Curated annotation (Swiss-Prot):
InterPro entries: NDH1_su_D/H (IPR022885), NiFe-Hase_large (IPR029014). This is NADH dehydrogenase [ubiquinone] iron-sulfur protein 2. Core subunit of the mitochondrial membrane respiratory chain NADH dehydrogenase (Complex I) that is believed to belong to the minimal assembly required for catalysis. Complex I functions in the transfer of electrons from NADH to the respiratory chain. The immediate electron acceptor for the enzyme is believed to be ubiquinone. Component of the iron-sulfur (IP) fragment of the enzyme. It comes from Solanum tuberosum (Potato). It is a peripheral membrane protein.
């Protein structure tokens, strides 16, 4: 397969939530392009 025929797409990564006993529970929904974060959607609050 050549690189001309390859289709590259972003992928979504769920990061968190961290430990429930930690202060300021945070969950991030990250849209990644390789190792680069294209978009980050924070979800702050309770589990």
């Amino acid at each position: 397969m050549t690189t001309k025929n390859r289709q590259i797409q972003n992928f979504t990564l769920n990061f968190g939530p961290q430990h429930p006993a930690a202060h300021g529970v945070l969950r991030l929904v990250l849209e990644m392009n390789g190792e680069v974060v294209e978009r980050a959607e924070p979800h702050i609050g309770l589990l």
